[in-house]
Amino acid sequence: MRCTTLIMVSFVVSCLLLSLVEESEAGAPPVECWSEILFSGKCGFHGKKKCYKEMESKLKQRVLKCRCEDVKKDSNTSKDEHYCGCQRENPYECN
């Protein structure tokens, strides 16, 4: 009886160890991929939607969420510009 119990316990422990090794070998998923591009014009009231459309057409990839930030004008810039920062859907295609 002891021998059978010992074999069963060692089998369970072996299975647990093997599953932990497989999980660690798979590696961590890639970190989020954010891209930021400068566009002409201001963000406006619907800046996030505007950035979403501009970034998808520019990157030719789906994006998950965006933020829009107007560039402050100084003496060197005469036109309105804004930065669009968006998170790409597929972090494996991050450049």
Curated annotation (Swiss-Prot):
Disulfide bonds: 33-94, 43-68, 51-84, 66-86
Localization annotation: Secreted
UniProt KW keywords: Antimicrobial, Disulfide bond, Fungicide, Plant defense, Secreted, Signal
Protein name: Defensin-like protein 232
InterPro entries: SCRL
Gene Ontology cellular component list: extracellular region
PANTHER family linked to this entry: DEFENSIN-LIKE PROTEIN 232-RELATED, DEFENSIN-LIKE PROTEIN 245-RELATED
Signal peptide start and end residues: 1-26
GO biological process assignments: defense response to fungus; killing of cells of another organism; signal transduction
Keyword Transferase: no
Top-level taxon of origin: Eukaryota
Similarity field: Belongs to the DEFL family.
Organism phylogeny: Eukaryota, Viridiplantae, Streptophyta, Embryophyta, Tracheophyta
UniProt entry tagged with the keyword rRNA-binding: no
UniProt note on tissues of expression: Flower buds.
